Design a protein with these regions (language model features):
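Aromatic-rich transmembrane-lumenal/periplasmic boundary elements in polytopic membrane proteins
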Residues: 56-59
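Interhelical loop and helix-boundary elements at the membrane-water interface
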Residues: 2-53, 65-169, 174-224
């Protein structure tokens, strides 16, 4: 047990001493905090109430992201607050941050999809996407499309766990798990090969997962 604890301690120290990886940890912690509250809130709130929250939030996020390029004051405040977690590409003129794509996907998924699917999709975005990045960047493994075997494995396994937990919590039937496994597999492939759709993963991950679940739900007349 002591050796195991020391191993994790050494790994943590090594990670935090790597500037690039430390930056990624900061990004992903922010990623989890800004996304996970959505499915958590939806567990306790009605759909109508949730949409009253999401729509103004999406407008605020998109407007801020747009005007940071147009207004010097907004740009300075934005980059002072969030500059340390942005990627280099997000500093470019007329670029959009991941928050904008997350806001767009939240509006679409929470408006159209049943509660269980929306909750599951955004827990996968918050947790699985984070694990894929952190594990994939730190653990040496073979390539899997444009990512790594380690990162994609972390994504797929964590997404399956989320799928199962959401299903148990909402008392879903076997069809949910059967089609959910297929949706998780497809989403893992899309996450590992972003050039296939060439869109931000804050958009593709929840939309691909929920679209597949909705498709099977409509074809087989399922009520998730």
């Amino acid at each position: 047990m002591t050796n195991l604890s020391q191993t994790f301690k050494d790994f943590f120290i090594h990670c935090t001493q790597d500037p690039e990886y430390k930056h990624e940890i900061q990004r992903k912690l922010f990623h989890i905090l800004t996304i996970a509250w959505l499915p958590i809130a939806y567990i306790f709130l009605a759909k109508k109430t949730m949409l009253y929250i999401i729509y103004p939030m999406a407008i605020l996020v998109i407007a801020t992201d747009f005007y940071r390029h147009k207004n010097i004051f907004i740009g300075k405040v934005f980059h002072f607050a969030f500059g340390h977690i942005l990627r280099e590409s997000e500093f470019e003129e007329n670029s959009w941050t991941g928050a904008t794509f997350m806001a767009i996907s939240a509006v679409i998924v929470f408006t159209i999809c049943p509660k269980t699917i929306a909750i599951c999709a955004f827990f996968i975005l918050a947790v699985s996407d984070c694990l894929a990045a952190l594990v994939g960047k730190k653990m040496t493994s073979k390539e899997f499309f444009e990512k790594s075997v380690a990162g994609s494995t972390a994504f797929g396994i964590s997404a399956l766990i989320i799928l199962i937990l959401c299903g148990i919590f909402n008392h879903e039937g076997l069809a949910y798990y059967f089609f959910g496994i297929f949706a998780v597999f497809a989403t893992t492939i899309i996450e590992a090969r972003p050039s296939f759709l060439d869109l931000d993963d804050n958009l593709t991950i929840p939309l691909v997962f929920s679209s597949i679940m909705m498709f099977f739900g409509l074809v087989w007349s399922l009520n998730y």
